[in-house]
Amino acid sequence: PAWLKAHFQRVERMIQRDKNHPSILIWSLGNEAGNGYNFYEAYLLAKKLDVTRPTQYERAEHEWNTDLFVPMYDTPAQVEAYAKDPKRTKPYVQCEYAHAMGNSMGGFKEYWDLFEKYDKLQGGFIWDFVDQGLKTVKNGREIYAYGGDFGPKGTPSDNNFLMNGLVQADRTPNPHIHEVAHIQQDVKFYGNDLKKRII
């Protein structure tokens, strides 16, 4: 239970700060930090402080201290298996999926076909929305630096692993954002019988 006080402070401060924001739908206990006693207690505290919203924690997986099942990077086959499993009743939201690095997003439509087919599946959060570059000047030119741009050659870095957004650091759209917009559009058109005026 070391750090329990810190867990409590973070949960209480988060809920007190954000409880009146209408866009806050779900409380999160954190990300990628294991599960155990502190997270069990933090979940109970969150439920005590706000009974109106669900609380989720990715590393709780199928344990009791999460109201949603929120995995990372499940394949479409894993997503459908969850949807078809009658023992799995919690709403499903991928807290990270469809890693948007480079010219990626392959398989995005397959995920959304499943999300729209099964009520238990609620969608997910694309990693990332925006490239994580920092504006700086190099050789007299303004650039968005990342990875190996800091320090001499050989300085430890994540290389281009931080450049994985739907939009660039300056918010210029990357090509795959258009696929996302199309697949997630509110209106779907089916059929092509124009003589009967059916679309």
Listing of model-derived features with the role each one plays in the protein:
Residues 1-199:
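Extended substrate-binding grooves/exosites of carbohydrate-active enzymes
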